[in-house]
């Protein structure tokens, strides 16, 4: 059976095919928005296309689209209880990559539900292959720009946890405005979290780790439960700390291994939702 309340996810165009143009809705003019990701190929090799055709209806949500392949129409919303067919604690992963972390968590915790937002179609296809191979049913995937979609996709206090593991670091100074973790995104995550819920982040770029820590501590709706802990001598504020121990549920993915092999270390950062009045 397909995902309740959603059409089966359409396949990306075959290699060499021209995608159908998408006109602006309502005759409006589309205004470019700074994105936290780069445009990557949507083409799938034959084996991943077969996987997509076979299992996408079980896992992939097809929303009404706005302007652009990764945008979600502002009048489209998800009801997790309808989508998953039950009421269970929800974790949202922003940027699931190939699904190593997500599928491992879903297999370990069948009593929880997991919603992935990802823009890289080959990564989604690999996630689907892993999910089907593991036999997990508590995953749903949405091809979407999270920063654009989340403000209208889900109700307040929907999620137990939000994960942002190893987002694009945008290393060049002129590109850092593209980083996903920002003050405005923190407010959106806080809106989604239930009281006491947590935002878990990890990065292996030191300056992004310091930024994540600073974003959490500047957000009026989040608390850093590890304030002052694990000071980093390389930090511009070396005595400040504010870093969490490694989350026990965060596996060492292929992506993290590449960073370790390059001599980078991972920082974990946590923001806890301050209870609503």
Residue ranges and their predicted role:
Residues 159-179:
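A short SAM/SAH-binding and catalytic strip from SAM-dependent methyltransferases
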């Amino acid at each position: 059976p397909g995902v309740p309340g959603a059409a089966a996810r359409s396949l990306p165009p075959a290699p060499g095919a021209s995608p159908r143009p998408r006109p602006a809705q309502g005759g409006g003019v589309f205004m470019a928005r700074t994105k936290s990701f780069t445009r990557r190929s949507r083409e799938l090799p034959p084996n991943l296309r077969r996987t997509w055709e076979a299992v996408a209806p079980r896992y992939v949500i097809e929303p009404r689209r706005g302007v652009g392949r990764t945008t979600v129409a502002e009048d489209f919303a998800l009801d997790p209880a309808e989508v998953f067919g039950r009421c269970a604690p929800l974790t949202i992963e922003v940027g699931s990559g190939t699904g190593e972390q997500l599928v491992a968590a879903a297999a370990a915790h069948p009593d929880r539900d997991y919603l992935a937002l990802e823009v890289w179609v080959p990564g989604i296809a690999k996630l689907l292959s892993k999910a089907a191979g593991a036999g997990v049913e508590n995953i749903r995937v949405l091809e979407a720009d999270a920063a654009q979609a989340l403000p209208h996709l889900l109700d307040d206090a929907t999620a137990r946890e939000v994960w942002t593991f190893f987002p694009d670091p945008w290393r060049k100074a002129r590109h850092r405005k593209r980083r996903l973790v920002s003050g405005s995104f923190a407010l959106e995550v806080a809106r989604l979290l239930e009281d006491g819920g947590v935002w878990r982040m990890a990065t292996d770029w030191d300056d992004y780790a310091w930024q994540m820590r600073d974003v959490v501590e500047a957000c009026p709706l989040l608390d850093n439960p590890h304030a002052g802990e694990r000071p980093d001598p390389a930090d511009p504020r070396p005595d400040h700390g504010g870093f969490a121990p490694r989350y026990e549920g965060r596996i060492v993915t292929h992506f993290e291994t590449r960073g370790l092999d390059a001599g980078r270390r991972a920082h974990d950062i946590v923001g806890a939702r301050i209870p609503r009045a």
